[in-house]
Swiss-Prot record:
Domain of life, per lineage: Eukaryota
The protein's name: Unknown protein 10
Organism: Pseudotsuga menziesii
Amino acid sequence: ARTGFGVLKPAMQGYPGLVLPR
């Protein structure tokens, strides 16, 4: 639920690219 944090470190959090469209 932390979008801001996901954008900062998506790889660390475990986001495949949902928050980071790059």
